């Protein structure tokens, strides 16, 4: 069955997405960091992720490590105000789910109070305790395995994971442990396509790939990557569907030229005084200082 790009109308839910996976329908997820990106993407995708990637995409950081709960809350609230139909997932930033189950629950619960439908956290077996704690509090959790950006220092950079036998088998074990702990879906990032396919076929929950080949239950890309809004290095797994950076610069350049040439604004883009005030304004002079 093929699908068009027509807008989705019904509100996405976790059971719905899991049913789609059983039916063979692929899930589409992208990032949203503010109300504008949410309104553009929401009619089209199934999941909106308020990702901690906001740090390097929008806030100028080199990676996601400096992103705080306060920053994530700010961006989540902006997206949630649009009342999206897509499932709204918020990323747990670095050190927001590491110290204790109590703090993890408090932070994740704050996301749900601000409008998120679920949270996403990175890591495998080490995170099982936190996942169970959240699920026991009725907080839906999406897991994230493979190239986990918050582990960039431990991994020695943004490198493909799971290319060695031990690493590949560990990832498969981690995927099952996260499923058993209650995750409703898993992001698989930066791993060989064959490994992602094996994980997907062995799980009952959806997998959402990014740099993990075509045989996941769905795919996610950063909004700005899809639209070509980023300069510089583009990862191999990114397919860009527009040169948004150039298009926006060209539009701004045309506007700037119109301003400098005195052709913006015109009378059609200006407000007019009532006719009876024209003479009053024309005859105005500064009052003398007292």
Placement of each model-derived feature along the sequence:
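Alpha/beta enzyme core
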Residues: 2-242, 246-275, 279, 283-290
């Amino acid at each position: 069955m093929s699908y068009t790009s027509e807008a989705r109308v019904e509100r996405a839910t976790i059971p719905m997405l899991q049913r789609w996976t059983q039916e063979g329908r692929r899930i589409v997820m992208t990032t949203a960091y503010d109300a504008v990106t949410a309104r553009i993407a929401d009619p089209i995708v199934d999941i909106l992720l308020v990702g901690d990637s906001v740090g390097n995409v929008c806030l100028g950081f080199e990676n996601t490590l400096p992103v705080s709960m306060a920053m994530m809350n700010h961006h989540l609230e902006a997206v949630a105000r649009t009342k999206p139909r897509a499932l709204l997932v918020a990323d747990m930033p670095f050190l927001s789910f590491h110290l204790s189950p109590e703090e993890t629950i408090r932070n994740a619960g704050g996301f749900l109070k601000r409008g998120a439908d679920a949270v996403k956290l990175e890591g495998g077996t080490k995170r099982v305790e936190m996942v169970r704690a959240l699920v026991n509090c009725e907080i839906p959790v999406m897991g994230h395995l493979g190239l986990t950006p918050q582990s960039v220092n431990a991994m020695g950079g943004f490198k493909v994971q799971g290319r060695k036998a031990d690493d590949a088998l560990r990832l498969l074990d981690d995927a099952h442990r996260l499923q058993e702990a209650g995750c409703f879906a898993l992001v698989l990032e930066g791993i060989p396509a064959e490994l992602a396919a094996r994980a997907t076929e062995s799980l009952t929950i959806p997998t959402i790939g990014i740099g993990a080949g075509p045989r996941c239950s769905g795919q996610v890309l950063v909004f700005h990557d899809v639209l070509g809004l980023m300069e510089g290095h583009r990862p191999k797994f990114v397919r860009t569907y527009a040169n948004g950076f150039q298009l926006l610069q060209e539009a701004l350049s045309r506007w700037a030229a119109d301003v400098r040439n005195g052709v913006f604004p015109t009378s059609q883009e200006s407000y007019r005084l009532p006719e009876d005030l024209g003479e009053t304004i024309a005859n105005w002079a500064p009052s003398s200082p007292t």
